[in-house]
Every structure is written in C-alpha cells, then in structure tokens.
Amino acid sequence: MMNIRELLQTRPLLFDGAMGTYYKAAPGVECEQANLTDPAGVLAVHREYLAAGADAVKTNTFSLPRLAAAHTPGWEQLAQAGWQLAVQAAGETGAAVFADLGPAPDTEAVPAGQVYTAVAKQFAALGARNFLFETLSSDAGLLDAVGAIKAEVPDAFVLVSFAVLPDGYTREGMYCKDLARRMQESGIVDAVGLNCVSAPGAMRTLAKQLGGTLPLSVMPNAGYPVVTRTQVKYQGRPEYFAKELGRLAAEGTVQILGGCCGTTPAHIAALRAELDSLPVVEKKAPAEEFSTVKEQTVENEDAFLRKLNAGEKVIAIELDSPRNADLTGYLEGAKKLQAAGADLLTIADCPIAQARMDSSLVACRVHRELGLCTLPHMTCRDRNLNATKALLLGLYAEGVREVLAITGDPIPTAERDEVKNVYQFTSRKLALYIVSLAGEGREMPGPMTVFGALNLNARNFDVELRRAKEKLENGMSGFLTQPVLSAQAVENLKKSRETLGADAKILAGIMPVVSQRNAIFMENEINGIHVEDWIIEKFAGLDRAQGEELGLAISLEMAKAALPYADGLYLMTPFNRVALMERLIGRLKQEVLGAY
C-alpha cells in the first residue's frame, strides 16, 4: 500500500471528493448505512474517484463517531464494511485508504476523546494505517485519540482537518491558527488542514495564512450551498475548483488536496489534470511562527481593571436595563451609583429569558455618556456565532473592554414554540472565542477581559469548581458569584479562593433582601440563590423601611465575611432601588472597605 510520507516528498497527495453529497442515499437514511445495504453503490463511488485520478480514498464512515457516542447498535459493522469496500477499490489501483472520522460530540458523560479512540481502535484492528479526522470545529479530546493511535500503530499517518468559516473561525468559535498551532506543537499529528464550510477561494486565503512545518491539507466545498425546491445543491464549476487549488499547490503552500461537500469525480478529475500540468517546484519553506493572542497591556485596561489588577477592592453593581425604550431614568440611576462610588456597572442580558433593552447597547451608552466602566452580560441563549461576533466588535469599538459570558436562563417551555433557544456555545466556549478574537492580524487589536459566573450555592460545589477551572483554562479572568446569603456560601467562597488561586479575580455577590416575601421568593424561585431560614424569619412583620434597614445590615455582615476571600463585591440591585444601593455603597466604604 502507498507510503504517504514518501509520496509527499515528491508530489502533492490528491484525495477523493465528497461521498455524502454525491452518493444518492434515500431521504432520512445515513449514507454510512449503504456500506451494508448498498455496498455495490458505495464501491462504485470509490471507483469513480479513483478513475478520476485520486491517490487516496476515504472510508464511507464520516458519521461513525456520532453513532458510536450514541451507542448506536451496529456501528462496528458499518466500520468494517466501510473499510473493506474502500480497501477493495483501492487495491485495484494501489491507492491509499484513510479511515475517515467526523466530529464526535463532547459531553461530560461521553468525552469526545473516548469516542474518537474507540472508533480509531476499531479501524486499527481492521488494518488501518492512515487516519483522517475531518470537519472538526474543536480539538477537544483529539490529541488523546491520536496518542492512542500512535501507541497502537507507531507508523500511523494522522491527518487532522478543521471546518473553518471564511473569517478563520470554526462554528465553536476556535481560531484556525490556534488549532493548527496546537496540532503542530503536539508532535504526534502528521498533517493538518482545512475542509468543508468554505469554498475554494476563501479556503485558499485561509491556507496561505497558516504557518508551521507540518504538511498542509485543503479540501474545500465545491462552492456555497443553495436551496432549489427543497434540495440543497452546491454551485461551483470543476474548472474553477481545480484552478484555485492548483495555485496553492504551485506555490508550495499545500501538499494534500481534495474535495468536500458538493464535489464530484469531475472536480477531482479537473484537479488531477491541473496538478499534473504543474512544473515541479521545491516545497515552500514553511513559516514556523504562529500568530498568538497578545497579552493584555496597560493601554488596554480601563479604570476598573487597573484598580482590580492593582489589588484594590472594587465595587461592581448590577442594574437591570429597562423593559421599554426609555433610558432616561436608567442613566440617572447609573449616574447616582457612579457618584456613590461604584467602579463598574454590570447589566444583565434579558434575565429569566424576558426581553429587556439590550445589555450591550446600554453598556455602550452608559460608557459613552457617563464614562463609567461597564460589564454587559452576554448569554449563549439568543445569538449564534455571527451575531455574537458582530456585537463583540461593536463593544470593543465603543471602548467596552469587559464582558460576562454566561449560558443564560432557558426560555420557558410554554414559549418555545414562538421563541427559540440558540445555545451554539457554552459559556466556556464563548470565553475562548472572545479571547481568540484578539491578536496580530485578527479582528481586535487588543483583548477583552472575560468574566464568568460562579455559583457558591451549587449543591455539588466540587463540580462547580471543576467547571470554574475549565473556564479559566478557556480564557476567563475571574468570576462574579451568586449572592452570599449563608454560611455555606462563605465557606464555598473560601474554598474557591484556595482552589482557583490568587490570579482568578472573584467578586463576591451581595444582594440585599428587602422583605420576607422577597426572601421566600428568592429561596424558592431563583436558581442559584439560597437564603438561610434565619434570614427569612427575621423579616417577619417588617414594613418597607424596616425591611431595607435589615437588608442593609445583613448585606454588610455578608460583605465582611466574604471580602477576605474576594477581590471585590458584586452588588445586585433589588427592584431597581437605586437609593438603597447608594446607601449600601456608602456604608460599605465607611464600615467595611476601610479595613482594606
């Protein structure tokens, strides 16, 4: 069988094109099922691509990781049949066979690395020596699987290919240069590349930006999809496809080429002819340096960050945006809180999934008119990748340098027929995406600082801390906690400081309880808040003024207990009572913060 490493020393390697969009599967039937139900049809497709001039074919097993993760009965038989059909076809021409693995879901219950390893080992047992991990939006668990392959098959050739949008980011918000760099630095991946999502022209531009010493692969779609009478078709002529990729090969930029969605044997035949017509050129010297995210500089810090990073205790205060289009009263309230001594105004993003004025737009207006630092909350609930990126670029242009990345409260079940959740990200992936936008040659000249949520009242706080560590690893700088209203919350805050370290900035949540009804509601209906019984009982029979006084007293005590383990306080305004929060800030400065 063909030795891939030796071939790449002499000429480019040409893969086949798409199987899924070329093979005519019945509606609703997985293309991979045809390995068992229509082996002759699958074999015929392999033979067409080989006749077109392909040096290598992929097994018809793209969806196997997803099927394996779902414990779909018979996925092993699909792998075996797919392998045997590809080997049979390749044996007729001496072509190489690559075991093809598409993306695996990555969950706590079934990690992606575990799935990739299981599927790869299945192929290794069948005799596979070449492996293609393709159309990936993330590298989660990937290197674990590659390491397992190399341990079992030391001479295995592993090609890893990511699905990258024309702007350089995957659908999970990971930047192509960062992904390529990690593959390069792993020392166990043999080639890296891009496939799917983008058309030839866009992928050519992306490929020219990648650095590193590994062989580079490109397998674009034939073009961009269009829907014609409910059918998805890809526009893009084989001649154009071949010319664009041929230019990359001629420049020595890429060494491995092929096609993805919408490509046919005609595209591969045109590319074969283009490659064969190229003069022999020396391989282009690879650029070993990758663009990395710039470290934060003083120039990119606002007044809040300078104070926080200097070790001073800060005060952040949350004020919910209006439910209507009038911002007059809100700006007046924000100005009063600023005068009282707030360092930062935080603005929730449609809490409890009820529409309010956009938190990011309000943050920009407050920052522009008052000069007060703002922290808009950004949920994963309502925006896809494009909308999120557009909003982040606008925030940066307006001088807003911090954002709180959270998953967001789900939309109530009764409303889901009319209003849909998005949740393209988790808060951890959103943080990584925001951080990746900054750096040389990227969309932001400097980074945004990303904070996350830390639930001190979580029932299984060890799991909460593990997630907090993952958030830090994904680029978050610190956390705003849920309200501290119990001794256990203080203890968990102390544990957080010990576990997460001094570099993780923690703002302890303080929310004044103002009545017994308010306390009972918070305890029973607001996720993430725990109010101890003694607090609820203390409010019995109190009027509004008395309730506020007691709420202030309890908040001061909680702040005193929390501050030894926190970098500042995160105050939450109940019922938009700005006057109450002015008093709280004043007393905190007078009675608590003076000790620091």
Question: PLM features: residue spans?
Answer:
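Domain-level signal for soluble alpha/beta catalytic cores
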Residues: M1-Y596
